Amino acid sequence: MASAHDRAVLQAIFNPTSPIGDVPGLNQEEELMDDDSAFDPELVKQVKDLELQGVSSAESGDLPAALQHFNQAISVLPQRASAYNNRAQTKRLLGDTKGAVEDLEHAISLSNGKGRSACQALVQRGLLLRLSGHDEEARLDFERAAALGSEFARQQAVILNPYAALCNRMLSEVISKLRNPEVSEMQ
């Protein structure tokens, strides 16, 4: 079995653009969860069922039905962040970017920036900010989501960080020279 150091070296060789130390499977943390302990368990179960119905509707292409399920979930338990996050995704798919951002901000606020819903909302908001050309704000959201455990957000934060991009480019060149020393001698 390879050591953590060996896996880190292999990661740097095969994925030179990923952040140094970003080794998939190296940090085997527990999956990020939302804290639902403050809510009535029966209401949480009801809301989760509504959210699953909403996700199922969205996956089958029935976005209006998905939106209706997420609206119902929010009306049952308006203090729970997850349904706002899911509704934001549906609103985005329906072309309502402004409404999506409002729901994402609500999800981040309700979750106190912690847990799975916060992580997902930060990633989604980061993507929307990036699409609208607000790269610095997007990078900040990606960094917060990365701190919560999102590998995708970590990669996006590196891409948007000019210093990290420069370091990764230099590392890629060094690794390329190590792989093909005769090519680098001719240059």
Swiss-Prot record:
The keyword Repeat applies. Keywords: Repeat, TPR repeat. InterPro entries: TPR-like_helical_dom_sf, TPR_rpt, TTC36. Pfam families: TPR_8 (PF13181). TPR repeats lie at residues 47-80, 82-114, 119-152. GO terms for biological process: cilium assembly; determination of heart left/right asymmetry; otolith morphogenesis; tyrosine metabolic process. The keyword Metal-binding does not apply. Belongs to the TTC36 family. This is Tetratricopeptide repeat protein 36. It comes from Danio rerio.
